[in-house]
Amino acid sequence: MLNSVIKRSALCRFKFTCLQVSECRPAQIEISKRLYSAKASGNGEYDLCVIGGGPGGYVAAIRGAQLGLKTICVEKRGTLGGTCLNVGCIPSKALLNNSHIYHTVKHDTKRRGIDVSGVSVNLSQMMKAKDDSVKSLTSGIEYLFKKNKVEYAKGTGSFIDPQTLSVKGIDGAADQTIKAKNFIIATGSEVKPFPGVTIDEKKIVSSTGALSLSEVPKKMTVLGGGIIGLEMGSVWSRLGAEVTVVEFLPAVGGPMDADISKALSRIISKQGIKFKTSTKLLSAKVNGDSVEVEIENMKNNKRETYQTDVLLVAIGRVPYTEGLGLDKLGISMDKSNRVIMDSEYRTNIPHIRVIGDATLGPMLAHKAEDEGIAAVEYIAKGQGHVNYNCIPAVMYTHPEVAWVGITEQKAKESGIKYRIGTFPFSANSRAKTNMDADGLVKVIVDAETDRLLGVHMIGPMAGELIGEATLALEYGASAEDVARVCHAHPTLSEATKEAMMAAWCGKSIHF
């Protein structure tokens, strides 16, 4: 049986590597080892200078030091962790978790046999809890820098020439000039602006402003039905705002599988969030204490003007390389201002590499982290690896949404013969006992080999459950392989096992 699995997995691994997302290039591993020519000569020159202290940058810096490279990290924010830790992933999860607890206590305890009265929101305390989490984690990265002997330069970096970076110090730090044999650009991304709409972070806000509102708005309009928009919309809806999501596309959720997107719209709508899909924003301007918004439905060309207390602009992010001096060096960039690199993260100046949001691929913190490790390993050891078919994505609404691999739409477009297996959380014993059983797991497999191609789920703790699916895809597992693994009972993970069984043999046990 093992031999057949190995042969099947090897065959499908070759086939599946051709299914790269257009923006992502496959990481290639060199067979031969290189000499450690990346090491500095000991004259004050660094082996590695990482520009940017976000998830990709700080991880690259730590890994570089662990591999024996004399490393310095330059960060202009004043705190490490980048957008993710300071004004993104981490503070948003704090608000998502605490707003969910509040909403559950206020609206979902009576049926559980818990009588509660007098529940209210202390927004300032909720914001303090968020800020405390951020502060703890940012200081934790500084500790890791010291532990691993990574030097930390607080300031704004700009290339003087391909070997030299000028750093203008901030927060009392001195200006300095850094010479290094290798550079990694990890400057991340910034909020994508909407033409004609001015973000003041008070009435018209980006995700940054939405994390720090001083009061719960009565009405909030969210421009963009992607991950950021729906997460922040969920926070403020739970706290009492009337939230309307305006989405240009026919469906919400961006790149997620169509079936999961439909389930998400249905479930989130029941929570009180309104959706206006196939709708474009024509204008938005502050009018006294409110924002006047004009939109147009692209299906019937009907226009609508209304007032909202806060407008959140969440239409995505764009690479950030401002002031770095890349044009002076002649570093190649594409039309979207992304730095172009090869399979080893090298720009057209080979000793300058780039990772994360500043280059191609999904703008995800964990993708940047893996690229940071791979880029440093290419420098120090001559080989690195990131499997771009196995980058999971998670939306932390309730229920959570998570996916890895290709969607059913992508399988159709690629001409792949495939099978589908699904299993609803309403048939999962742990979800039922938790009274939290909305959603499903959907598995896509190669019809000829049973090899996993994609796993998509919406349901309780989906962000934690997707790890098993990602591991299975990484190692070329079949649906049968996962279905035959004993899963503890009662657990939410049994829903994954049952969906795998449905994909493999056509039938699950409990549905």
Swiss-Prot record:
It is an enzyme of class 1 (oxidoreductase). Disulfide bonds join C84-C89. GO terms for biological process: 2-oxoglutarate metabolic process; aerobic respiration; glycine decarboxylation via glycine cleavage system; pyruvate decarboxylation to acetyl-CoA; pyruvate metabolic process. The active site is at H489. InterPro entries: Class-I_Pyr_Nuc-Dis_Oxidored, FAD/NAD-bd_sf, FAD/NAD-binding_dom, FAD/NAD-linked_Rdtase_dimer_sf, Lipoamide_DH, Pyr_nuc-diS_OxRdtase, Pyr_nucl-diS_OxRdtase_dimer, Pyr_OxRdtase_I_AS. GO terms for molecular function: dihydrolipoyl dehydrogenase (NADH) activity; flavin adenine dinucleotide binding. It is found in: Mitochondrion matrix. Keywords: Disulfide bond, FAD, Flavoprotein, Mitochondrion, NAD, Oxidoreductase, Redox-active center, Transit peptide. Binds 1 FAD per subunit. NAD(+) binds at G224, G225, G226, I227, I228, G229, L230, E231, E247, L281, G316. It catalyses: N(6)-[(R)-dihydrolipoyl]-L-lysyl-[protein] + NAD(+) = N(6)-[(R)-lipoyl]-L-lysyl-[protein] + NADH + H(+). Its cofactor is FAD. FAD binds at residues 75-84, 93, 157, 187-189, 357, 363-366. One of its GO terms (cellular component) is glycine cleavage complex. It comes from the Eukaryota. Pfam families: Pyr_redox_2 (PF07992), Pyr_redox_dim (PF02852). Its EC number is 1.8.1.4. Lipoamide dehydrogenase is a component of the alpha-ketoacid dehydrogenase complexes. Malfunction of this protein blocks the progression of cell cycle from G1 to S phase. Belongs to the class-I pyridine nucleotide-disulfide oxidoreductase family. The active site is a redox-active disulfide bond. Homodimer. This is Dihydrolipoyl dehydrogenase, mitochondrial. It comes from Schizosaccharomyces pombe (strain 972 / ATCC 24843) (Fission yeast).
